[in-house]
């Protein structure tokens, strides 16, 4: 693969988002438990291999691939109930 093809490919990835694999389900959050907090591993892009904690709406299970728009933010950790 030439340098130009590599640039084009990374541009396409960044345009649509970064694929990330769900490696752990941490728990449910939100007022009614509609959000699932998961730990994901970034599969491509400049942060490849980095592990993040993110909040996901909808059904999700270990091994699913999510497309993240950005890889900078990380969800706050779940805290115990008061």
Swiss-Prot record:
Keywords: Ribonucleoprotein, Ribosomal protein. Pfam families: Ribosomal_S28e (PF01200). Gene3D superfamilies: Nucleic acid-binding proteins. PROSITE patterns: RIBOSOMAL_S28E (PS00961). Transmembrane segments: none annotated. One of its GO terms (biological process) is maturation of SSU-rRNA. GO terms for molecular function: structural constituent of ribosome. GO terms for cellular component: cytosolic small ribosomal subunit. SUPFAM superfamilies: Nucleic acid-binding proteins. NCBIfam families: PRK04007.1 (NF003080). Belongs to the eukaryotic ribosomal protein eS28 family. This is Small ribosomal subunit protein eS28. It comes from Aeropyrum pernix (strain ATCC 700893 / DSM 11879 / JCM 9820 / NBRC 100138 / K1). The gene is rps28e.
């Amino acid at each position: 693969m030439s340098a130009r093809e590599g640039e084009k490919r990374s541009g396409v990835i960044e345009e649509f988002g970064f694929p990330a694999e769900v490696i752990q389900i941490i728990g449910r959050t939100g007022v009614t438990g509609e959000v699932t907090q998961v730990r994901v591993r970034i599969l491509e892009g400049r942060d490849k291999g980095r592990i993040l904690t993110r909040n996901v709406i909808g059904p999700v299970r270990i091994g699913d691939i999510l497309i993240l728009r950005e890889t900078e933010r990380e969800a706050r950790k779940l805290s115990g109930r008061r």
